[in-house]
């Protein structure tokens, strides 16, 4: 992905964000699923997914109830 926006360049320079974005280009996942798949703490993954969503690189596509909470599922936005 090529970009001239410095915010996007900085966001994509972070290794974990790049890995998350690559996974979400292939499949829809929740932060918990990404955490398990990438072997990273859930808090870190959730933070970076929110950052990517704030930049419009991923979007919320589905919510499902899970143990009294709501699980959010994201997918990469193709630009």
Protein language model annotation of sequence segments:
Residues 22-24:
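Short alpha-helical segment immediately N-terminal to, or the first helix within
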Residues 8-14, 30, 61-79:
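Short, cationic-aromatic polyanion-contact patches
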Residues 1-19:
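Short alpha-helical segments that sit at the start of domains
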Residues 56:
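Glycine-centered, phosphate/nucleic-acid-interacting loop/turn motifs that mediate DNA/RNA or nucleotide
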Residues 33-39, 52:
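A short acidic, leucine-rich amphipathic alpha-helix
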């Amino acid at each position: 992905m090529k970009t001239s926006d410095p915010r996007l360049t900085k966001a994509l320079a972070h290794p974990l964000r790049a890995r998350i974005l690559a996974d979400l280009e292939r499949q829809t996942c929740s932060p918990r699923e990404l955490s398990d798949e990438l072997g990273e703490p859930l808090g870190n993954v959730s933070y970076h997914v929110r950052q990517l969503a704030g930049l419009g690189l991923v979007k919320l596509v589905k919510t499902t109830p899970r143990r009294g909470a709501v699980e959010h599922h994201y997918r990469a936005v193709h630009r």
